[in-house]
Amino acid sequence: MPMKLLKLHLFFVFAGLIAVSCVNSDNKALLVGDWKGAEWLAEGKPSGNDASKVQFSFAGDGGYTSDFGGAKEKGTYILRNDKLYTTPDGQLEIMVEVAKLTKDSLVFNMNRSGQSETLTLLKQ
């Protein structure tokens, strides 16, 4: 491969990596803060779970806390593309799909025991 072509190829590889890393950091900046549940659906219908009792707090340093109606946990998180990976202290990693993330809303798509669930949270 001629040197000029190699340089051009490397340029596009690095430009792509920078673009992906900027998107991930933009999304992480949107995620940081306090979130409260607004709606919890199972198979597109009300789940019977009280979404207002769900709270998350994501810190810029990769730490998080959550409260599911009194069941509290804390740990670390990684946001990668459209997936949020949380690892509660002393437990295994959990992954949820981030269907939507804006400055004021966060939507998780989850699968519990084969049942599709959607949890919508609003930034506090």
Describe the function of each predicted region:
Residues 1-21:
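Sec-dependent bacterial lipoprotein signal peptides
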Residues 20-74, 80-124:
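Lipid interaction determinants
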